[in-house]
């Protein structure tokens, strides 16, 4: 992806993006690699054109089908947690949505395998990756709760919708030393963003923040 091709003007300009990055830094995002990715990946291309002027607000936005693109702080913090120790070679993402989170990871050099259960969103995300020449992102239409065993093990797993608990198949696909970042709690319950690490065969869990995500649902549509 050539960031210079997608600078935008007005409310999508580089100056607007820089203001967002400054705000994220003020709110605790420290990793300069993550801040650079947020600066360079054109979030306005991952939302409806009518919402482009709000793309660099630190807020979630609707993307249709009852789904949202996460607020930039959440994307930045989840990314920061995944790459804290090293850039993972392969990451599995459950819940492609618009594709923005996957694009941020790909900008950082990660090979991303992402699954979306809503066909229209999967098709749109796949086309965006082609348009942006993000060849490291592989989009699959399907039920993410089963993971994507074909490309396992993953050094990172990121869940962008909230399950009650982490789906069991994902544990078999997380590499030793790998990290899983997910919002847990499901619909109608308080949710917490957690980091789970596999260390010497054991799973170590850490609470990161209180969050609000759409629920992780099974099946496809």
UniProtKB/Swiss-Prot annotation:
GO terms for biological process: methylation; protein modification process; protein repair. Pfam families: PCMT. The active site is at residue 70. Its main location: cytoplasm. It is found in: Cytoplasm. GO terms for cellular component: cytoplasm. One of its GO terms (molecular function) is protein-L-isoaspartate (D-aspartate) O-methyltransferase activity. Belongs to the methyltransferase superfamily. L-isoaspartyl/D-aspartyl protein methyltransferase family. HAMAP family: PIMT. This is Protein-L-isoaspartate O-methyltransferase. The gene is pcm.
